[in-house]
From Swiss-Prot:
Species whose genome carries this gene: Prochlorococcus marinus subsp. pastoris (strain CCMP1986 / NIES-2087 / MED4)
UniProt xrefs under Pfam families: ATP-synt (PF00231)
HAMAP family (alphabetical): ATP_synth_gamma_bact
InterPro entries the record matches: ATP_synth_F1_ATPase_gsu, ATP_synth_F1_gsu
Cellular localisation: Cellular thylakoid membrane
Protein keywords: ATP synthesis, CF(1), Hydrogen ion transport, Ion transport, Membrane, Thylakoid, Transport
Main location: membrane
Oligomeric and partner information: F-type ATPases have 2 components, CF(1) - the catalytic core - and CF(0) - the membrane proton channel. CF(1) has five subunits: alpha(3), beta(3), gamma(1), delta(1), epsilon(1). CF(0) has three main subunits: a, b and c.
Protein's name in the database: ATP synthase gamma chain
Length: 316
């Protein structure tokens, strides 16, 4: 059995570690709310943009419009945009998305395509750059804002557009982590190019709010109601031709799709970090309790041994 000093030092170390993990949990919890607020702020623009595109689509078939972002050509080269975090300590968040990319990459090769990677986040960059003999990397992006903004998505959008318009890629897919709940998220694959505009907000979207009760962190959730009262009127007249409108709107729509993926990934990362740090805090508390019990037993054994030695000495 370890001596009392070693046990006491370990108890102090575990308690200090618990303070750190608890602080990280609270910081992540606060940032999750910020990430969700950012999604809400960007949603009105995304919703309006989608409705304008839907209105144009109702008047002219996209297939008849001469826009390079809508053109569907024979697919040979496929770019995969992979979104991970810059940091760890977020459970299986980074591991799950990297596994999803590896599986998708292998599927495309098996089907006869030529995939390549556009990596976002230091974790993906570090992992795949160490395996350059197996993966083709086109470009990398790192050190984005913790709560992504349009500026963060602009650089990725420009790179994706350049790859597609130069025909270096015939299709672009994005692999990111979809935020479901504070304790649940899942890697998903979405086709970015060629574009196929559809609604942005879903009927069952939920927003999770962090509250406190009796000094404990709680989660409240509420459904988002889609507002159909501000739909564009059916008799609206566009001064420009559909081609001109789409050339202006489609890049914006693409950037918004990428921004949405970045925001969902950021919210998922923070939620995973909050959960991981919460589990770490609970484990540290349990370990400290076990060590305290061990310390008390060792101390009791030491006292008993001293008493026996005193009694034995007096008997002599």
């Amino acid at each position: 059995m370890a001596n009392l000093k070693e046990i006491r030092d370990r108890i102090v170390s575990v308690k200090n570690t618990r303070k750190i993990t608890e602080a990280m949990r609270l910081v992540a919890a606060a940032k999750v709310r910020r990430a969700q607020d950012q999604v809400l702020k960007s949603r009105p623009f995304a919703d309006k943009l989608a409705r304008v595109l839907e209105n144009i689509q109702s008047r002219v078939q996209f297939e008849a419009v001469d826009s390079p972002l809508l053109s569907k050509r024979n697919v040979k080269k496929i770019s995969l945009v992979c979104i991970t975090a810059d940091r760890g300590l977020c459970g299986g968040y980074n591991t799950n998305i990297i596994k999803k990319v590896e599986i998708r990459y292998a599927e495309l090769i098996k089907q006869g395509y030529e995939p390549n990677l556009i990596l976002v986040g230091k974790k993906a960059i570090g992992y795949f750059q160490n395996r350059k003999d197996r993966y083709v990397i086109k470009s990398t992006f790192k050190e984005l804002e913790q709560v992504p903004t349009a500026i963060d998505s602009e650089g990725i959008t420009n790179d994706v557009l350049a790859e597609f318009l130069s025909e270096n890629s015939d299709r672009v897919e994005i692999i990111y982590t979809k935020f479901i709940t504070l304790v649940s998220c899942a890697p998903v694959v979405q086709t970015l190019l060629p574009l196929d505009p559809q609604g942005i907000a879903e009927d069952n979207d939920e927003i999770f709010r962090l509250t406190t009760k009796n000094s404990k962190l709680l989660v409240e959730k509420s459904n988002i109601e889609k507002n159909d009262s501000d739909k564009l009127p059916s008799d609206i007249v566009f001064e420009q031709s559909p081609d001109q409108l789409l050339d202006s709107l489609l890049p914006l729509y693409l950037q918004n799709q990428i921004l949405r993926a970045l925001q969902e990934s950021a919210a998922s990362e923070l939620a995973c970090r909050m959960t991981a740090m919460n589990n770490a805090s609970d484990n540290a508390k349990e370990l400290a309790s076990t060590l305290n019990l061990t310390y008390n037993k060792a101390r009791q054994a030491a006292i008993t041994q001293e008493i026996l030695e005193v009694v034995g000495g007096s008997a002599v």
